[in-house]
From Swiss-Prot:
One of its GO terms (biological process) is translation. One of its GO terms (molecular function) is structural constituent of ribosome. Part of the ribosomal stalk of the 50S ribosomal subunit. Interacts with L10 and the large rRNA to form the base of the stalk. L10 forms an elongated spine to which L12 dimers bind in a sequential fashion forming a multimeric L10(L12)X complex. Keywords: Methylation, Ribonucleoprotein, Ribosomal protein, RNA-binding, rRNA-binding. GO terms for cellular component: cytosolic large ribosomal subunit. This is Large ribosomal subunit protein uL11. Belongs to the universal ribosomal protein uL11 family.
Length: 141
């Protein structure tokens, strides 16, 4: 018989840098999960993606065991890294803070494709392009 899921916890953590301090400790501690076991496993799985924020979805079972799924980094993080900017524009309609080429946009779309609600690269590129436009990043051909 399958274990019963008691809770699903969603966190966004720096790759390879999870530690028992907040936000990880309190989120997992209230469900009785072994915090250090999670931190070690998460850090081992994400150490090759250092410098990125990696969302994680933790399923906690009634016997206090857990499994987790790592997602792809948020589109905004990938866009800021590719454009070489620190953050998006406060007024995206007026102030452009950077630009991306079509090839960079396609690379980000390929990275995000498993987590997006689409199947083709073209539609994934349109989704990422909309995110970039809202951040004040222009797309050049």
């Amino acid at each position: 018989m399958a274990k019963k899921v008691v809770s699903v916890i969603k966190l966004a953590l720096q790759a390879g840098k999870a530690n028992p301090a907040p936000p990880v400790g309190p989120a997992l501690g209230q469900h009785g999960v072994n915090i250090m076991a999670f931190c070690k496993e998460y850090n081992a799985r994400t150490q090759d993606k250092a410098g990125l924020v990696i969302p994680v979805e933790i399923s906690v079972f009634e016997d206090r065991s857990f499994t987790f799924i790592t997602k792809t980094p948020p589109a905004s993080v990938l866009i800021t890294k590719a454009a070489g900017i620190e953050k998006g524009s406060g007024e995206s309609a007026h102030g452009k803070v950077g630009s991306l080429s079509r090839s960079q946009l396609e690379e980000i779309a390929k990275t995000k494709l498993p987590d997006l609600n689409c199947t083709s690269i073209e539609s994934a590129m349109r989704i990422i392009e909309g995110t970039a436009r809202n951040m004040g990043v222009s797309i050049s051909d």
